[in-house]
């Protein structure tokens, strides 16, 4: 048990009978009144979000989830299958991957963290940076060099991100998976 003051982003709490990951906390104090803690939460089972408030001294059940390093194996509609170092396979529903699904490709070498709740794989966390190939983008516009010019590009895995104007089809680029932003050409 933690008080609402002690909860930090990244903690997993039990709220309304489900596990929720804390994405953001905001504490406000007003004159004589006790502190109010506002939490932005994401439900790990339903992949939905909400915001809620607690009094600073309210007790909150924190839970510790199991996490395991795994590699992507294959897609069996509607499940993504991941394998650990001991060749155990874990199914994760496609809807639970969220934005990570755009970065998953056959034969990927990056290791992902699979999160478990009560023995069931419920989510996948990608590495913070990955390298993917650009499979489609428009050619650069000649003479358009005023400032930071970005254009849309489709990467292996099917995701679309904004890349710098100098990036061409076939280039390998580094992507920040937390924000979905282009970092550099590799």
From Swiss-Prot:
Record PANTHER family: ELONGATION FACTOR P, ELONGATION FACTOR P (EF-P) FAMILY PROTEIN
One MF annotation (Gene Ontology) recorded for this entry: translation elongation factor activity
Coiled-coil regions listed: none
Biological processes, Gene Ontology terms: peptide biosynthetic process
Domain of life: Bacteria
Pathway: Protein biosynthesis; polypeptide chain elongation
GO cellular component, one term: cytoplasm
Family: Belongs to the elongation factor P family.
UniProt-recorded name of the protein: Elongation factor P
Primary site of residence: cytoplasm
Cystines in this chain: none
Key words of the record: Cytoplasm, Elongation factor, Protein biosynthesis
InterPro entries named among the record's database cross-references: Elong-fact-P_C (IPR015365), NA-bd_OB-fold (IPR012340), Rib_uL2_dom2 (IPR014722), Transl_elong_fac_P/YeiP (IPR020599), Transl_elong_KOW-like (IPR013185), Transl_elong_P/YeiP_cen (IPR001059), Transl_elongation_fac_P (IPR011768), Translation_prot_SH3-like_sf (IPR008991)
Species per Swiss-Prot/TrEMBL record: Shewanella sp. (strain ANA-3)
UniProt-listed Pfam families: EFP (PF01132), EFP_N (PF08207), Elong-fact-P_C (PF09285)
The protein's role, per its UniProt record: Involved in peptide bond synthesis. Stimulates efficient translation and peptide-bond synthesis on native or reconstituted 70S ribosomes in vitro. Probably functions indirectly by altering the affinity of the ribosome for aminoacyl-tRNA, thus increasing their reactivity as acceptors for peptidyl transferase.
Subcellular location: Cytoplasm
SMART domains per record: EFP, Elong-fact-P_C
């Amino acid at each position: 048990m933690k008080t609402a003051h002690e909860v930090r982003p990244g903690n997993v709490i039990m709220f309304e009978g489900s596990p929720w990951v804390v994405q953001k906390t905001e504490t406000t104090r007003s004159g004589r009144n006790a502190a109010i803690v506002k939490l932005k939460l994401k439900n790990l089972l339903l992949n939905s979000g909400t915001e809620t408030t607690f009094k600073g001294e309210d007790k909150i059940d924190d839970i510790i989830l199991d996490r395991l390093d795994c590699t992507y194996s294959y897609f069996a509609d509607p499940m993504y299958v991941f394998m650990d170092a001991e060749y155990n396979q874990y199914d994760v529903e496609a809807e639970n991957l969220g934005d990570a699904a755009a970065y998953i490709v056959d034969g990927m070498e990056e290791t992902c963290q699979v999160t478990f709740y009560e023995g069931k794989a419920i989510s996948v966390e990608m590495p913070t940076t990955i390298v993917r190939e650009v499979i489609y983008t428009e050619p650069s516009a000649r003479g358009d060099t005023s400032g930071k010019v970005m254009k849309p590009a489709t990467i292996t895995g099917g995701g679309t991100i904004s890349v710098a104007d100098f990036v061409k089809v076939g280039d390998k680029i580094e992507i920040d998976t937390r924000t979905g932003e282009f970092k550099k050409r590799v």
